[in-house]
Amino acid sequence: MNKVNYQKILDGIISNLQKTNTVPTLLLHVCCAPCSSYCLEYLSQYFKITVFFYNPNISENAEYQHRLNEEKRFISEMNFKYPVNIIEGEYSPLEYFSAVKGLENEPEGGERCKKCFELRLEKTARIAREMNFDYFTTTLTISPLKNAPLLNQIGERFADVYDVKWLNSDFKKKEGYKRSIVLSAEHNLYRQNYCGCVFSKREAAEKE
């Protein structure tokens, strides 16, 4: 089975937008400011973006607020070609714990993470449909630790369910992850050492 090049698909979409002089709207699910840094710098050249900060997997309120505030600060400090807005999803850790019930002991990157991806991407697709966005996608594919093919498959599935276009991506390509590190340093962004949930925090602590 041939491996799908999601960055190549995105390149094709962007090329078509440029040929038609079209600037569509994009609802971008964002997990944190560092991951969003390159994605926003890159995509804002071609899309009118609204950041959707929806991360009920972050179990500690202080951590959640810190990440949200860093996202807002980064957006305010950047000079984007097209304006970038931000909306906040409901912060309900109980929603996350309900979604992953029975999978608490799964390893990082396993079935529990898949459920978390599904929770966040379905909500993003639903909001994109309700607010009439042209596309939706997520910053999660920038992480070397995240399964980009799985994320794209989930996104495509909910695109069909909610009748809204999924923007394929693998943002770690084209040195995207390295660029995010540079941007994070330039803006002194808070870079956490775990994804967000108590389980990933525990695993990170065990590795230290």
Predicted regions and their residues:
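Nucleotide-activated chemistry modules centered on ATP-dependent adenylation/adenylyltransferase
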Residues: 1-38, 46-208
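Aromatic pocket-lining residues of Rossmann-like dinucleotide-binding sites
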Residues: 43
